[in-house]
């Protein structure tokens, strides 16, 4: 029950290549990564990874947030949340449009027993759409997007997650593994929670791009074996929801199907909300609470 791959792509990778960015020495095997120090001394680690099947040897940035008491409690283990569009998660200076989710600031002000791992997307052309789609579809410019989301999730589940579990003090079981994202990343979070439900018990899907291929999204959810302890948070901003009929229809149909599968679904329309990082930032405390974090 729960072990279903909607896209069962053979996993071709043999390891993650890590590119050191500085000469800092980090405890617990995080060697030679770039440390971003916050005013109160907390840290976000940055390093580069490659995903050969998706982007060859081109590096992309990965981010790791460790809880404030991580070094003080060497026997303590933590849940892990994996996030998409890692460059938009923590810092405005790294964000595509100059505004991030502000996750570092939130966690400094609201400490959580939680490790966060976030990997940057592919910025080249329409590669983000390709890597963050579990299915093939035609976009608004009539381009065919041949989705490689299955390859991306396989990399996360079979390469990135084992590396994090080996090098950090995680709670590696399904009950303590969460996936989150927004827009196309929100679609991927839903994909993770359904097709990879044996790995991810909880998901935060903010403004998920269900509309790109609504029929295929519904098929993805319908075919998945989802355990009844699964929790999914899904929201849309008021401004994006009521201006797009396709978004409304996709949300209602997907929510109905999730409920028929007895998923613990938290569904919200955000008053005044729109499709942007500034809006998603405001939802952090809400989805964290809904997911029991």
Task: Indicate where each model-derived feature is located.
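Non-catalytic cap/lid and distal C-terminal segments of serine-dependent acyl enzymes
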Residues: 30-293
């Amino acid at each position: 029950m729960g072990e279903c791959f909607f896209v069962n792509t053979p996993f071709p990778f043999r390891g993650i290549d890590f590119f050191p960015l500085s000469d800092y020495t980090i405890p617990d095997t995080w060697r030679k990564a770039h440390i971003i120090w916050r005013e109160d001394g907390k840290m976000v680690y940055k390093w580069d990874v490659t995903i050969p099947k998706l982007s060859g040897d081109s590096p992309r940035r990965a981010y790791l947030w460790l809880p404030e008491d991580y070094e003080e409690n060497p026997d303590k283990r933590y849940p892990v949340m994996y996030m998409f569009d890692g460059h938009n998660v923590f810092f405005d200076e790294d964000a595509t449009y100059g505004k991030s989710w502000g996750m570092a600031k939130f966690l400094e002000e609201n400490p959580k027993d939680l490790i966060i791992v976030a990997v940057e997307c592919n910025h080249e052309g329409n590669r983000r759409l390709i890597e963050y789609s579990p299915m093939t579809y035609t976009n608004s410019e009539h381009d065919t997007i041949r989705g490689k989301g299955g390859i991306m999730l396989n990399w996360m589940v079979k390469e990135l997650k084992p590396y994090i579990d080996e090098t950090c003090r995680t709670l590696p079981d399904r009950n303590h593994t969460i996936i989150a994202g927004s827009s196309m990343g929100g679609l991927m979070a839903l994909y993770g929670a359904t097709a990879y439900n044996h790995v991810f018990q909880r998901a935060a899907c903010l403004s998920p791009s269900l509309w790109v291929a609504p029929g295929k999204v519904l098929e993805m959810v319908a075919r998945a074996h989802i355990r009844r302890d699964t929790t999914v948070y899904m929201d849309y901003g008021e401004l994006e929801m009521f201006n797009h009929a396709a978004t409304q229809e996709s949300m209602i149909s997907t929510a109905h199907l999730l409920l028929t599968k007895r998923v613990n679904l938290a569904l919200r329309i955000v008053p005044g909300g729109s499709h942007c990082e500034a809006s998603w930032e405001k939802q952090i405390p809400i989805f964290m609470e809904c997911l029991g974090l």
